[in-house]
From Swiss-Prot:
Xref: Gene3D superfamilies: 3.40.50.2300, lambda repressor-like DNA-binding domains
Full protein name: HTH-type transcriptional regulator MalR
Role summary: Transcriptional repressor of the maltosaccharide utilization operon malEFG.
GO molecular function terms noted in the UniProt entry: DNA-binding transcription factor activity; transcription cis-regulatory region binding
Keywords: DNA-binding, Repressor, Transcription, Transcription regulation
Species classification: Bacteria, Bacillati, Actinomycetota, Actinomycetes, Kitasatosporales
Coiled coil: none
Residues in HTH lacI-type domain copies: 1-54
Segments of the chain annotated as binding DNA: 5-24
Native organism: Streptomyces coelicolor (strain ATCC BAA-471 / A3(2) / M145)
Length: 344
């Protein structure tokens, strides 16, 4: 056995003690090192112990908000598939109203011995939350990556879409169609993605329509909930202020905006244009098919996994924010402004 350990150690470039830990399934070995030892076994023609055949590299926690918004299951699927390809087993922990909190889910995952955690739209996106919870987690030696949100108080990799650019794409599209009264429906202001969307929206409306920032924020921005009902309420208010187009911070809100327009006897897109955000699964098949700003979910999910595995493997990525560009997808819910039709 000693000769065998020495051969494997030499082939893998690690100590015999490390080889022993891998063969006996002991913790405390980096994923990349474990893979090197298993590869050495294969190269030297040794048969892998039964427990190491198709063995998971470990558990990785994924904490998401409620799954009613279809963008979260889509992102969870991308992350789960990427983890599985790397030999890890994803453990999905979902927050629900009245259910477990993020802190409780984190504690549960740590107790289960996860190798790391990916947070999606968690408390790191809430400017009123205590960010010390993440520093305490880091002190426990648990690597983590934060998706959709940012805080300079947390030393960790962040993965985000460019929310400001998303609003610029949406507003520019609507202005090109002749709309001059464009509203924005989005969630509570304490969330970082909301603040960034407002910044991008206000700046683009200022630049392209010449309105003051004060006027835009006071008359054209409506906060609500990230739900269909929330979008309906916000859009009703904006249409009541003579908006002929509404940009929504999620596709679910956009579906609510379409419902609001119809309940007011208006047609989408003939009377009111609606733009969503996310490009959730099946959103192309709504009536009308929704024009939306596509969140780069595959790229973000894969980057989150890659970054976390670098943290787990001991070669951490920079503790900064990786920002991914969104894409405008034009479908059937936007059209020329009512007053622009028929003009040469």
């Amino acid at each position: 056995m000693t000769t065998r350990l020495a051969d494997i150690a030499a082939q893998a470039g690690v100590s015999e003690a490390t080889v022993s830990r891998v063969l006996n399934g002991k913790p405390g070995v980096a994923a990349t090192t474990r893979q090197s030892v298993l590869a050495a076994l294969d190269v030297l023609g040794y048969e892998r112990p039964v427990r190491l055949r198709q063995r998971s590299e470990g558990l990785v926690g994924l904490i998401t908000p409620e799954l009613e918004n279809p963008i979260f299951p889509a992102l969870a699927q991308v992350i789960g598939q990427a983890l599985t390809r790397q030999g890890y087993t994803p453990v999905l922990a979902t927050q629900t109203p009245g259910g477990s909190t993020e802190d409780e889910l984190t504690e549960m995952l740590v107790d289960r011995g996860v190798a790391g955690i990916i947070y999606v739209s968690g408390l790191h996106a809430d400017t009123t939350a205590d960010m010390q919870r993440y520093e305490r987690l880091r002190a426990q030696g648990v690597p983590f990556v934060l998706v959709d949100g940012f805080s300079s108080q947390v030393q960790a990799p962040f993965i985000s879409p460019d929310d400001r650019a998303a609003m610029s794409l949406a507003v520019t599209h609507l202005v090109s169609l002749g709309h001059t009264r464009i509203g924005l429906a989005l969630g509570p202001k304490r969330f970082v993605p909301v603040q960034r969307k407002i910044e991008g929206f206000v700046r683009t409306v200022q630049d392209q329509l010449g309105l003051s920032a004060e006027t835009v924020e006071k008359e054209l921005v409506q906060h609500s909930l990230y739900t269909l009902e929330g979008g309906q309420a916000a859009a009703s208010a904006l249409i009541g202020r003579d908006c002929t187009a509404v940009v929504c911070a999620s596709d679910m809100m956009a579906l609510g905006a379409i419902r609001a327009a119809r309940q007011l006897g208006l047609d989408v897109p003939k009377d009111v244009s609606v733009v969503g955000f996310d490009d959730s699964p099946l959103i192309a098949f709504t009536d009308p098919p929704l024009t939306t700003v596509r969140k780069p979910v595959p790229a973000m999910g894969q980057a989150a996994v890659r970054t976390l595995l670098e943290e787990i493997g001991g070669t951490p990525a920079p503790h900064s924010e990786f920002v991914f560009m969104p894409e405008l997808v034009v479908r059937g819910s936007t059209a020329s402004a009512p007053g622009e039709r028929g003009r040469p």
